[in-house]
């Protein structure tokens, strides 16, 4: 019921903050796996999220050259990855369509700015957050994602050649 005591609490914000549930979503962020946000970024600029975004608030420019990703495989990377948070409707479609588990939903909701235009465009440097951060805000989901990525990496490893038969 709407009138339950648990639902009718007053919080002295910003001194006190309610704990957000794990499945809450606000705005997307990019996950990186190493200590370097640029080198460890999971995004390979495939632009699927940009194409699928209903309000078209994601802007990606693919790099000209390839560089090794966090697994050592040469990949393209986003030279530019911007999200216009004044347009984003937090629908999570970008997260669902990403085949590389590179984009996830954040719990940060305090993104107000004094300026109206350029400050509401989140750049790649602002969007990149570590896998450790992802584990802190979505622990159950992050464990499952990491297990799936590890299983996929093991599956792609080449099988060692069999020893020649003696005879």
State what each model feature region is.
Residues 1-87, 96, 101-167:
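Non-ligating segments of multi-cofactor redox enzymes
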Residues 91:
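Basic, alpha-helical nucleic-acid-binding regions used in initiation and control of genome expression
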């Amino acid at each position: 019921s709407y009138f339950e005591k648990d639902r009718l609490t007053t919080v002295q914000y910003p001194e006190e903050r309610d704990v957000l549930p794990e499945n809450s979503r606000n705005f997307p962020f990019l996950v990186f796996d190493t200590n370097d946000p640029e080198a460890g970024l999971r995004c390979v600029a495939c632009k699927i999220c940009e194409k699928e975004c209903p309000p078209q608030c994601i802007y990606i420019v693919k790099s000209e050259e390839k560089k090794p990703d966090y697994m050592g495989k040469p990949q393209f990377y986003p030279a530019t990855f911007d999200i216009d948070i004044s347009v984003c409707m937090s629908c999570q479609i970008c997260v669902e369509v990403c085949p590389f588990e590179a984009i996830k939903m954040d719990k940060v909701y305090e993104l107000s700015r004094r300026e109206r235009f350029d400050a509401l465009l989140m750049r790649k440097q602002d969007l990149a957050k570590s896998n450790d951060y992802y584990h802190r805000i979505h622990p159950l989901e992050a464990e499952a994602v990491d297990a799936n990525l590890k299983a996929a990496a093991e599956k792609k490893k080449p099988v060692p050649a069999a020893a020649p038969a003696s005879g």
